[in-house]
Structure formats: C-alpha cells, structure tokens
Amino acid sequence: VLLRLAPDAISRLGAALGDGVTIVSATNGKTTTAGMIAAVLAAEGRRPVHNRAGSNMTWGVATALLEQHGSEGLFEVDEAWLPKVAAELDPALIVLGNLFRDQLDRYGEIEVLADQWANLVEARAGRTRFVLNADDPLIADLGRDTSQHRREGVLYFGIDDPSQALPELQHAFDAKHCRRCGHPYSYERAFVGHLGHYSCANCGAARPSPDVAATRIELHGMDGTEATVRLPGGEIRLSLPLPGLYNVYNALAALAAGLELGVAPERAAAALGDVRAAFGRVETIDVGGTPVAILLIKNPAGANEVLRTLRMEAGGDGLDVWIALNDRIADGRDVSWIWDADFELLAADVRRVLCAGTRAPEMALRLKYAGWPTERIEVEPDIGRSLDQAVAAAPGRLFALPTYTALLELRKLLSSRGLAKEFWE
C-alpha cells in the first residue's frame, strides 16, 4: 500500500540513513549473511534498520524503513530487485554472495541476472564499495573492468583450503563458461556447486586472490564449524555454531563486510561465534519432545550442501527425514531442479522419509530414482499431518527439509502451537 501511494517512499525514507546503507544479495545465504552482519554491527553497539524478517523485495525494505528508526541501514535484497533498490537507497556497501540457478520460471537463466548486476556495478563504480565472492566466477567477474583489472573499492572473499574440495563436479554446476570470452572454465577444485578455483585457458580470466580467506576448515556436522581466516592484517580463528561450507562463505562475507564497516576482525569473529540461525536455516525446534532440525532447500546447490551436512550425521539405524516440496510462485513452478540435486548422497543413510507438500509424489519419485529404499518412503501432502507423522515415528532427531513456501507453512504451524515465533528475529 505504501509504495502504491508513494512510489518514492524507499528513497525518501532512506535519505534519513545518514551513516550509510549496506545491501546484501545472493541466491543462497542472503538472510543468514545479513543476520551475521547485523550481529557484527551489534558488537559495536550499532543497530541498523534491517529487514530481518526476510521480506527482501521492495515492500519488505519499505516496511523496515517505515517501522524502524536509525541512522544506518542493512537490507537483504532479492536478486532481481537489487538494481531498483540500490538506485533508491544509494548504498555505501553492497555484498554479493553467489548466483545459482533458482526459480527458472521467474528469473530465467542466471546469466540474465549476472548481466543486470554487471550493469549495476559499472554504474556505481566509485560511489559504492563491493564485497564479492572470489570463488563464484559470475560474482568475481563483476569486480574487474574491461581490462581485467580489479575495480577500485572491491574486496574479495573465498575459501583457500584444498581439503574441502569436492571429489568431482556436481550436477548443480551453473557457471560453465567464461563471461569474458565464452570458453569453458577449467576448475582446479570446486567447493559448493560452481564455487571454487577456476581459470579460462582462452582469455586468462581467473579467480582473483581473496582478501578474506578461510585457510583451514574443520566441519563438525550439525555441531558447527571452525576455521582459520586470513585477513589483510593477519589471521584469526573463527568458531561458527552453524554447519557446512555454505555458512563458511556466509561468515567470510560478514567478516569482509565488517572490515569495510570499520569493525575489528577479532570483535567480528567473536560476534559470529554467538550468531543464531535464522528460522529454517539450520534451526532446531523441539516438537513434542522430538528435536526437529529445519534446513531450507530451494535449488540444487543449496540442497546439495544440506545433503552433505546430513551425511556427516548418518550412523546407527539411519536418518529420519521430512521433505516438503511445494511449487507455489515463491518456490518457482518448475520443480525439475530436484533432479539436479544429489539426493543419491543419502541413499544408504536413511531410516525413514516422509514426503510432503504440493509436489510430494514427485519428490518421492525422485528419491526412488536416487536409490532410496522405496519401503522407507511415505507420502502425505498435508504439511501438518505429515510433520506429526514424521515426529511420531522418529526415535531421535528429525531432519526437516522444506522448500521456501513449505518453510513458511511450517513456521506458521509451529507458531500456532507456541513452538516458534511467527517471524524470525
């Protein structure tokens, strides 16, 4: 309603943020990364206006500006809405985490978004500083000019630990060709999807050396992660209470943003050591005495990282899993992405799985072809009934893997039972 009555509301309200605006965007991890940056700023006593509820299109940004007061802004922004929001808020810093194939029926291929982002970076060069993922060729390339020199005001982050490389490239490999010349990239190693160490044999474009890099990473499954992080001024140790390499990337982005925002690395690392997961981003909630670990899945790359994390938890009689696959507009109507996610990773490690959501039968079929024992696969489309059945049957922890709108349904359900807040904080 606000934007219909006052289309310039974001720019007008944003003008009050005299201490600057930071924008975070990515296909995967923007909510978590923005939350991490908020925690880093809070360690300095700074409380930015922040759309922490996860509503990341123009109306979510406008609502945060209308309801909160402060002199500094921190906003996660949907990938497609980034150019418009950036034009209205004139950010001092933009953090770009990754681009993965996601909601093809809404956005088209990721190269379209990469082109839009390239135009944004070109237009804002010299006015905005950028924190970019060196390991994503689509993102890293934004930080170079036409002569392949690093643009002024660019800080790169990435992973420099070969021990964490995948044994082979995944199906979810979205950036195969050089944006400069179209030649296929050569990968020395890949960490998450197409994130890794790459180069183009034709034109010489290659992964830039990151300014903020994780050099020694120890993954402890759901118990969290430890890493040594190399910074321009030395090394620090990071203990993160969140699992997976994807959260290492999120933390590196937050540390790099902290540097740009004037927060001492040691203080930023300490803040990240106490960070809480956003709802559905590796949060555990007690449901009827059963711990339910909720891990959002919405595209092949993100799902693969969740599956890698769960494989570290496997043992004994196997894992109890609840997967809710929806095909509503916010999920994307096209659910063919499930065939590119490596569900085969857990085929030998599952005790029981219950498929829910509007496309539950398709999910069950995908698991069958992934080699999950059919006698362990059940289908109940209703979110509430299926969750209750899965909880009742689980002897221990239940792993809940919902897509985006299924996560919203789950959040509403748990909130109605007094088990979770309706909006994450």
Language-model features and meaning:
Residues 69, 90, 126, 150, ...:
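Short loop/turn motifs at secondary-structure junctions
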